[in-house]
């Protein structure tokens, strides 16, 4: 890959579709951006170390969300308490994530690390502990659990029931360009709920395991043990439990 192509920004249409009524405040639909679609990008986690935050230090900057900063920092601390990841407010670093108030219900994050300004948009639909944790998972380099190449062994995806703008988040990736970390996790902070991104009155995903459920990330309050091990493995955290 050439330097020029690496820094080319892919213009991606992002649509975070929030359903009305009781689900109106939940994370739902398309919520991640990629600076470039390339073999560097895995679908369980980023493939190459060059796309991970150097030394596991995530540099961030707030440009809005004044009244939500304490909550966002609590989510960051939850990650730091369970992994070797640390979060540092920006001084003059070139590579950092800008955290801001997105338009209406727009929630998305640029994937992994780049040596320039990245975005983490937290609109009205993403201001819960779980939704912020989900987006920070993308910032660290985690993709959606339902995109794993082995996902069909664990869930049924109903593509016809998914809103067009969110179909990309349900695309299954191939084993030849994907490194899968750990077992499938029905409870992962990175998996969608069974009605997320749905067309009216339909289900987008069902589990194959009896007794398992799929819950919207906005209703969750922590990383699972498997989420933690995946991050620790991805960043090769010393002294931490890894796969």
Swiss-Prot record:
Zn(2+) binds at residues 134, 138, 144. Residues 1-24 form the signal peptide. The active site is at 135. Glycans are attached at residues 176, 216. One of its GO terms (molecular function) is metalloendopeptidase activity. Binds 1 zinc ion per subunit. Keywords: Disulfide bond, Glycoprotein, Hydrolase, Metal-binding, Metalloprotease, Protease, Secreted, Signal, Toxin, Zinc. It is found in: Secreted. One of its GO terms (cellular component) is extracellular region. Pfam families: Astacin. Disulfide bonds join 84-237, 107-126. GO terms for biological process: proteolysis. InterPro entries: Astacin-like_dom, MetalloPept_cat_dom_sf, Peptidase_M12A, Peptidase_Metallo. Its EC number is 3.4.24.-. Its cofactor is Zn(2+). CDD domains: ZnMc_astacin_like. Residues 44-238 form the Peptidase M12A domain. Inhibited by 1,10-phenanthroline. Expressed by the venom gland. The keyword Lipid metabolism does not apply. Residues 25-43 form a propeptide. Zinc metalloprotease. Provoques deadhesion of endothelial cells from cell cultures, and also degradation of fibronectin, fibrinogen and gelatin in vitro. Its role in the venom is not fully understood but it might act as a spreading factor that facilitates diffusion of other venom toxins. Alternatively, it might be involved in the proteolytic processing of other venom toxins or it might play a role in extra-oral digestion of prey. Monomer. This is Astacin-like metalloprotease toxin 3. The lineage of its organism: Eukaryota, Metazoa, Ecdysozoa, Arthropoda, Chelicerata.
């Amino acid at each position: 890959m050439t330097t020029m192509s690496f820094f080319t920004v892919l213009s991606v249409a992002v649509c975070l579709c929030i359903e009305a009524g009781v689900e109106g405040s939940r994370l739902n639909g398309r919520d991640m951006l990629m600076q470039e679609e390339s073999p560097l990008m895995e679908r369980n986690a980023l493939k190459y170390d060059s796309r991970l935050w150097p030394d596991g230090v995530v540099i961030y900057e707030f440009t809005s969300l004044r009244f939500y900063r304490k909550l966002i920092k609590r989510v960051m601390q939850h990650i730091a308490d369970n992994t070797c990841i640390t979060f540092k407010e920006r001084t003059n670093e070139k590579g950092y994530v800008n955290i801001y108030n997105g338009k209406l219900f727009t929630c998305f994050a640029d994937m992994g690390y780049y040596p320039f300004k990245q975005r983490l948009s937290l609109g009205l639909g993403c201001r819960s502990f779980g939704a912020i944790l989900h987006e920070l998972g993308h910032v660290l380099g985690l993709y959606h659990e339902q995109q794993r190449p082995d996902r069909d062994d664990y869930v049924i995806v109903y593509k016809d029931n998914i809103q067009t703008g969110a179909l990309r988040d349900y695309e299954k990736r191939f084993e030849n360009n994907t490194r899968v970390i750990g077992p499938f996790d029905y409870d992962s902070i990175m998996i969608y709920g069974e009605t997320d991104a749905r067309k009216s009155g339909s289900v987008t995903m069902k589990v194959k395991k009896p007794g398992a459920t799929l819950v919207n990330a906005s209703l969750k309050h922590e990383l699972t043990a498997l989420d933690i091990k995946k991050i620790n493995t991805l960043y090769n955290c010393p002294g931490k439990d890894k796969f």
